């Protein structure tokens, strides 16, 4: 799908209302050269943070959500190994869900991804990818976005949580049965493995 078509989809989902920018401004942010390209159009958190993007996700007619115990999602930034274009809208090339990295912990997966000449996705990138292709979120085939991490409150190092996107089972902590089957932005411990969560990555980024 061309970037112009992806921007149209985001406009249909309400990007103008979310950003307070009109269509002309958003087209200008992408740039004419990129509109005819392919890839995945990403909404930078400076334009719309992940917590506000998540409700645009849908599955089985249910909107996405951020787990209630992740109110600090906006404080998750980039790990040192990853750089993204400092523009409101940019493009990913070669996104992979990372199914072959299911049952790998984020700590184990990061060096493997880097050794392949790739980098992991951020949480905004993961949401942006699913907004364009919701079918990529499947039972037992979901993914972590380990490029987004939160610094520790005090001292060096990172908070032990890594964001992930999967499908809610309607647990009470998710808000109950009405959210069963909905897209869910949550977190996993960086040292834990999950048989149903891959580690998503990308070949390159551009603007």
Predicted regions and their residues:
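A binding-site-centric feature that preferentially detects glycan-recognition modules on secreted/surface proteins
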Residues: 1-119, 125-207
């Amino acid at each position: 799908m061309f970037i112009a078509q992806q921007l149209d989809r985001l406009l249909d989902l309400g990007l103008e209302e979310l950003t307070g920018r009109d269509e002309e401004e958003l087209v200008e942010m992408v740039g004419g050269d990129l509109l005819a390209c392919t890839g995945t159009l990403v909404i930078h958190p400076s334009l719309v943070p992940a917590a506000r993007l998540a409700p645009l996700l849908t599955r089985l007619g249910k909107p996405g959500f951020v787990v209630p115990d992740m109110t600090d999602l906006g404080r998750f930034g980039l790990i040192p190994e990853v750089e993204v274009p400092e523009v409101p809208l940019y493009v990913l090339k070669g996104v992979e869900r990372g199914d072959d990295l299911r049952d790998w912990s984020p700590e184990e997966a990061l060096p493997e991804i880097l050794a392949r000449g790739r980098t992991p996705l951020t949480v905004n990138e993961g949401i942006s990818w699913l907004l364009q292709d919701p079918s990529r979120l499947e039972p037992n085939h979901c993914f972590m976005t380990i490029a987004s991490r939160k610094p520790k409150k005090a001292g060096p190092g990172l908070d032990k949580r890594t964001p992930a996107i999967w499908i809610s089972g309607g647990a009470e902590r998710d808000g109950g049965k009405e959210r069963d089957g909905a897209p869910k932005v949550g977190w996993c411990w960086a040292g834990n493995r999950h048989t149903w969560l891959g580690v998503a990555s990308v070949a390159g980024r551009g603007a």
